[in-house]
Regions:
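Active-site helix of classical SDR
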Residues: 108, 144
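C-terminal helical subdomain
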Residues: 162, 168-169, 189-231
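The beta1-alpha1 cofactor-binding region of Rossmann-like NAD(H)/NADP(H)-dependent oxidoreductases
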Residues: 48-58, 90
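Conserved glycine-rich cofactor-binding loop
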Residues: 10-11
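Conserved glycine-rich Rossmann-like NAD(P)H-binding loop of the short-chain dehydrogenase/reductase
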Residues: 24-39
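Substrate-binding pocket helix/loop in short-chain dehydrogenase/reductase
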Residues: 84-85, 92-97
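Residue(s) in the substrate-gating loop at a strand-loop-helix junction
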Residues: 128
Length: 232
């Protein structure tokens, strides 16, 4: 059995990644705070807020105890808002950092050492174009994504030649429900939803990366809508 763990897998990119991995033959463990514990054919759902160390420990204990060390871990869970610096409260900032940066740290810390010990595995980090391009209104989000990029690169260095592969996937805007509150179609300067990437575009890139032969390490993938390419 080839085992994959996907965080934030109840909707959007995470759900699409989980579905594509399952279609590719993986047994997929979906983690999300909105899920209910359960199982189906080649799928296990665990309710887990990845920013909570206790919940992560519970989920990891179940995964490793019942299914083993995963072959693939996709760190995808996160949140998003657009607020200028002066509009972003300390609470806004800390909550977003907890979801987007602390959560991936906890998940990677829980699984990567066991992969290294086994001598194989693949960590996929879902970043963003905001991990290398600055946008007005993204003080907190950019801090989390630049931080995630930095953490991912350090993990890559620390796992070099261990048999564990790492891939950072940095997409431009993806048409998911995180944009509902923003309503980009009504605002100048925003990519219109019809022109955005689909969650499935990102998912297909993830599956492609993790199904390359062991000697091939896909270190980074950047995906942007064609209308967006000059800034990507």
């Amino acid at each position: 059995m080839t085992l994959a763990v996907v965080t934030g897998a109840s909707r959007g990119i995470g759900l699409a990644v989980a579905d594509e991995l399952r279609a590719a033959g993986f047994h997929v463990v979906r983690l999300a705070r909105s899920l209910t514990d359960g199982s189906a054919d080649r799928q296990t759902d665990l309710r887990c807020d990845v920013s909570d160390p206790t919940q992560v420990e519970r989920a990891v204990t179940r995964v490793r105890g019942e299914l083993g060390v995963p072959d693939v871990v996709v760190n995808n869970a996160g949140t998003f808002f657009i607020k200028r610096l002066e509009e972003t409260s300390p609470k806004d900032f800390s909550e977003l950092i907890a979801a987007n940066l602390t959560g991936p740290f906890l998940v990677a810390r829980a699984f990567v050492p066991a992969m290294v010990e086994r001598g194989s595995g693949h960590l996929v980090t879902i970043g963003s174009i905001s991990d290398h391009v600055a946008f007005s209104g993204s003080t907190a989000y950019a801090a989390s994504k630049f931080g995630m990029r930095g953490m991912h690169e350090v993990i890559r260095t620390e796992t070099a030649k261990s048999g564990v592969r790492t891939t950072l996937v940095s997409p431009g805007p993806v048409d998911t429900d995180i944009w509902d509150a923003v309503d980009p179609d009504s605002k100048p300067g925003f990519t219109k939803r019809k022109d955005m990437l689909r969650a499935e575009d990102v998912a297909e890139a993830v599956v492609w990366a993790v199904t390359r032969p062991p000697k091939v390490d896909v270190t980074e993938i950047r995906l942007v809508p064609t209308v967006y390419a000059p800034r990507g």
